């Protein structure tokens, strides 16, 4: 149907006869000559329709609506000097049409303009409802091409490193760890259910037992969890697993992979190796295991300095086993007023969202004099004040913000305030930090969290992470005692405060795997029921192995400089996990439910 793509024509095609297909981006009538911007997936070409070419041709051109699908036959020629568009790669040429055929008209009115010349912002709801139209827009086309290029770059890199791509099952069994599963009833096996995979975790480990050694997959994953801007109920991972590699070898290989992607897609040289921070250091310095290191305001523990100053908020927190920590805001005296820190202010509100009751503060004035609330100023002696200023490295003009209480809440509070102020003070939107890619590995995570409500241990990542051998010792008799305090051989890759992915070395000893499952409350009988096939495999010569997975949607979001992963996915769901275009999820017929031996108990109370 066509001889060339619109965006591929150049000066060397002048005087060539071509046949093009695409959508009418816009039509313009200039003094009796009609100009059509014809758009296809490659770009735009100007079509000129001259009345001298025939009345029928001209009448068709006059009747065209935007987004009509047409076929054009004509000759490529140079544009007149005054018509050259240097902004377009095809801007020096045009096609003089001698045949114009409408392949499919537009019926009715379009819900929004698609033209490359129309950049009017649209509500996301209408974009998602008519996604097939939204995909024609330059923004989405660019994002999907970038996504494709990212995947191809990763594939090429991994295949050069000896990896092979293997698909793992989509219909699998439900297991007790992780988020809620999406369940699929089996018609053939009455009363039984499949689960959609939250990750290919167990299957990729079984591939290592099977001797594959280096596996990767662009894997579809499914999690029934609460959503936000960078989460979807179905998402894509760049998933990997490797045998006979140490943690450091895995980190180094993936640093090179990330550097390769950023060089190919963004043209940026990323310095490797990436910094490594232990989980504990990350929490101590930033209050989070996903730190943004493009700016300062690191946390400082001042508990030992302020414990005896007579301020009950501080002393009470420390006596209860908590802590007092602070961040220093350089030149904060000018940029942050007291009103913003006190109840009702925006800085106060950010702290409150994290669970804090409020923030204390000190303003450093000339000659290191301080302004603060009376309860602190009246009880802080010169030695304590000097120690505080020395430890925080505060100078005149700086503002010190304090959080006190349970250390976990203190960390969440100062992390949230730190991120909020970085945006408010434009620390990450101007200058060097605007185009700064601060990658780092967070390592040495705790193996377990302790769930205070349920009074039991939970795996911080998942129950297949290998513990640090130094932490558990070589004697299996000590595993039960040492495991809860052990560090995992786990690692997360963080970029500018966002987790790009993570992984770990895996347990390849069946006894240790059983003990880890017992530690999180999965008894031996239940472990055999839920994970028996994995435990059996580990008994049959499982190699040392490890891996990781990157969130592909999130990587593409960052590379494309979008704010939401929904703008990097062809057909995403909303934050209510709905597809507005296909109207999914939807009710199904009673006949379908009967075939699956399912009865609905849901009652519409509206």
From Swiss-Prot:
Keywords: Aminoacyl-tRNA synthetase, ATP-binding, Cytoplasm, Ligase, Nucleotide-binding, Protein biosynthesis. GO terms for molecular function: aspartate-tRNA ligase activity; aspartate-tRNA(Asn) ligase activity; ATP binding; nucleic acid binding. Aspartyl-tRNA synthetase with relaxed tRNA specificity since it is able to aspartylate not only its cognate tRNA(Asp) but also tRNA(Asn). Reaction proceeds in two steps: L-aspartate is first activated by ATP to form Asp-AMP and then transferred to the acceptor end of tRNA(Asp/Asn). GO terms for biological process: aspartyl-tRNA aminoacylation. This is Aspartate--tRNA(Asp/Asn) ligase. Signal peptide: none annotated. The record marks 30 as: Important for tRNA non-discrimination. ATP binds at residues 223-225, 232, 499, 551-554. Residues 201-204 are annotated as: Aspartate. It catalyses: tRNA(Asx) + L-aspartate + ATP = L-aspartyl-tRNA(Asx) + AMP + diphosphate. InterPro entries: Aa-tRNA-synt_II, aa-tRNA-synth_II, aa-tRNA-synth_II/BPL/LPL, Asp-tRNA-ligase_1, Asp-tRNA-ligase_1_N, Asp/Asn-tRNA-synth_IIb, AspRS_core, GAD-like_sf. Its main location: cytoplasm. CDD domains: AspRS_core, EcAspRS_like_N. Homodimer. GO terms for cellular component: cytoplasm. Belongs to the class-II aminoacyl-tRNA synthetase family. Type 1 subfamily. It is an enzyme of class 6 (ligase). It comes from the Bacteria. L-aspartate binds at residues 177, 223, 461, 506. It is found in: Cytoplasm. Its EC number is 6.1.1.23.
